[in-house]
Regions:
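Acidic, Ala/Val/Gly-enriched low-complexity intrinsically disordered segments
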Residues: 4-5, 10
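Charged, amphipathic alpha-helical stretches
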Residues: 6, 18-90
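Terminal, non-catalytic domain-edge segments
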Residues: 22-27, 430, 449-452
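Amphipathic alpha-helical scaffolding segments comprising HEAT/armadillo-like alpha-solenoid repeats
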Residues: 24-25, 50-61, 87-99, 124-143, ...
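Structural detector for internal amphipathic alpha-helices that build alpha-solenoid repeat scaffolds
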Residues: 37-48, 67-85, 107-125, 143-170, ...
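Post-signal peptide N-terminal segment of secreted/secretory-pathway proteins
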Residues: 80, 94-105
Length: 452
């Protein structure tokens, strides 16, 4: 079946001649960096045209926020499958993994996941490259005498390699044994150092691990040290429940207030803010309303955005983001009229959205697209999504959703745009067919379900 990629509304397209599946190399790379499914469609039509870009994608993580959306390894793997000489791409990925050095990026996870896809297809060179890197990092951990006075990148790399390599119970037990031996032999190791691996794979192979722990002291040590960390975290959580406001400060306190605080508690923090005159301490008091909406007239907070104290300025802008009040909208519009077109000001407009602001909000988003300011565009998307949350009394700026789908650099946030487009019956067959190849697994599943 021939599939034409979904085309965004013409007024939001940078290239007015864009024709769906047929893209220039520049259009292709920009769409690929966002993880849009049209790139898979385009590669299948004209693989040689995009070969160098797909090869580039093999060598590095290019997800905007891999911690939230995952890497783009499946997405890259699917594009590579359009080429008959897969070994060329596997060798390039293996070479990048060999050259990789711990740096705190998500490159290692992208490279190792991509190689594992090919290893599962029977390419031994891909599996060998993974095993060699795992052995290299593990050997380095055993050679280390102390924990570094920085983020322990090597530990994170080892855990990520373990997650990728543990594809069945046998490989899981081998890696759990290696991690347990590290716990036994190295004093610098701390309980819960492999919490991600334990929670992800340990639950999957729990019974197998418990049985093996009775016979293998390394696996037993791994199980004990990870379980001890879970117990400690649960105890800490219970302590925080007893007197939450005594144990929480800043943004954490504000989140608790937004969901659980009674009116009397909120008023106490309002009073604490009002009575404070010293700018630095006033900023600290106002952090209680970073997430919890300020319940009274916000004019004092608006005035604090003009403070000479930068900390108080920033805290005031953050507090205004949660307030739906005519004076806040008027403040935002006045700022725009005076040339203040910042992401912080856009957030106030999004929270206080009314249909009359449709044109100016589109204009502000278009400015970010033209400047390729994707961080600000990403932030604007999150501000807009607040209007769609359950229980929100904000009118839905649904006309902005196609723009967010098209240009949001984060596939996790793009998923939100699609969810809200679905609620407003804005999804088309063309769009869903493109989503079948999206970099985001949840988007692909949603599209497949709706196209049945």
């Amino acid at each position: 079946m021939y599939i034409v990629a979904w085309k965004p509304p013409e007024r939001f397209r940078q290239n007015k001649s864009f024709t769906g599946g047929y893209m220039t190399k520049k259009e292709f790379k920009e769409a690929m960096l966002r993880g849009l499914g049209r790139c898979v469609i385009a590669v299948r039509k004209e693989p040689e045209k995009y070969r160098d870009i797909v090869l580039w994608a093999c060598k590095r993580n290019f997800a905007y926020d891999a911690q939230s959306e995952g890497t783009r390894s499946w997405y890259t793997y699917t594009m590579v499958n359009a080429y008959p000489d897969k070994e060329t791409f596997i060798d390039a990925t293996a070479d990048a993994l060999k050259r990789y050095r711990p740096n705190g990026s998500w490159d290692l996870l992208h490279l190792s996941e991509l190689l594992m896809f090919f290893a599962m297809d029977g390419y031994e060179s891909a599996r060998n490259a993974l095993e060699e890197k795992y052995k290299e990092v593990l050997t380095g951990m055993f050679a280390r005498k102390r924990r570094p006075n920085r983020v322990f990148h090597e530990l994170s790399d080892l855990e990520q390699l373990g997650l990728v390599l543990a594809v069945d119970s046998k490989s899981f037990l081998r890696i759990a044994g290696d991690f347990g031996r590290l716990y036994r032999e190295k004093k610098y190791m701390c309980d819960g150092d492999f919490a991600w691996f334990f929670s992800s794979k340990g639950g999957q192979y729990r019974r197998t691990m418990e049985a093996a722990a009775r016979k293998d002291e390394n696996i037993a040590c791994f199980f004990q040290r990870e379980s001890a960390d879970i117990v400690a975290r649960e105890e800490l959580w219970e302590q925080r429940k007893v007197n939450p406001t005594e144990n929480l400060t800043g943004v954490r306190l504000s989140r608790w207030m937004a969901s659980k605080a009674d009116k009397e508690t909120v008023e106490r923090y309002v009073l604490a803010y009002r009575e404070q005159t010293q700018p630095e301490l006033r900023a600290v008091a106002l952090t209680a309303f970073s997430c919890c909406p300020y319940p009274d007239d916000p004019h004092s907070i608006i005035e604090d955005t003009r403070s000479n104290c930068e900390e108080l300025q920033n805290t005031a802008w953050r507090a205004l983001e949660n307030i739906r009040y005519p004076a806040v909208r008027a403040f935002a519009l006045n700022n725009i009229a005076n040339g203040i077109r910042t992401p912080e000001n856009f957030a106030l407009l999004a929270t206080n959205y009314v249909p009359e602001d449709e044109e100016i909000m589109e204009e502000l988003l278009q400015e970010l697209i033209t400047k390729k300011d994707w961080d600000s565009f990403h932030a604007a998307g999150m501000d807009i999504y607040r209007a769609f949350r359950e229980g929100s009394d904000i009118l839905h700026p649904k006309h902005l959703l196609p723009i967010l789908y098209e240009y949001n650099p984060c596939s996790f946030c793009r998923e939100s745009a699609l969810v809200y487009m679905s609620k407003h019956r804005m999804l088309t067959k063309e769009l869903l067919e493109e989503c079948l190849y999206d970099s985001n697994d949840d988007i692909r599943r949603m599209a497949a379900k709706r196209l049945k």
